[in-house]
Amino acid sequence: MNPSPLSSKNALITGASSGIGRAIALALAEHGVSTALLARRKERLEEVAEQTYKTGCRACIFVVDLSDPAETETAVSRAAEELGGIDILINAAGVALQSGLSNGEFEDWKTMMDINVLGLANVSRHALPHFPDSGGHILNLSSMSGHRVPGKGGFYAATKFAVRAMTEGLRQELRAAGSLTRVSSISPGFVDTELLDTYFANTDDRTSRYDRIGYPLLKPEEIAELVLHQLTLPATAEVTDILVRPTAQAT
């Protein structure tokens, strides 16, 4: 069996304790990637690290609140030192709250902005100096809500439109600087993760994720497969964004 083209690379993953971030961390480990796992919940991170060890790859965990700039900078620096550099950055951390623009809570808006936008930008800028001169890959988790605005999620959509803008903006900055580091994003529709529970927390609907939406959802592992596809493309190819939704999702 031929070794994976990702073998022996180092990846920093935010939001690695659950959902899509967790699935990506485990998929990368299966391909021989050493990982730095960043999230808020230590017990969850330890569980992901234990699963990673079973593949023979190493993982280090960092409990961090990405809304805290200094804490984030320290975590990224320590992760890069522990790994011996960063080849891949996966910005998978995110918060989804159904907080409207006309009647939403300011604290909800601030939480989404701090994690989805400022946290992502802060992790990226502190990780970049640790990338190899030959170039690495930054992959941001966006959303279908970064392409169209759902009726009750205007502010969340605004943060995901911002992720798309930052993805393209950073890509252009790096090209102008002569860097070959690729920058891309994935924009999923509904994925079967606890993020949906948070998104619907402000409603009276307490049914299951499936019953709430009414059709089979994407699985985190399916998003991880798309991540692997992007990361293993030839160095001369760069997919800027992938839109993926459940087959039954109309919009």
Language model feature labels by segment:
Residues 100-101, 105-111:
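Substrate-binding pocket helix/loop in short-chain dehydrogenase/reductase
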Residues 124, 159:
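Active-site helix of classical SDR
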Residues 17-18:
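Conserved glycine-rich cofactor-binding loop
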Residues 43, 63-74, 106:
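The beta1-alpha1 cofactor-binding region of Rossmann-like NAD(H)/NADP(H)-dependent oxidoreductases
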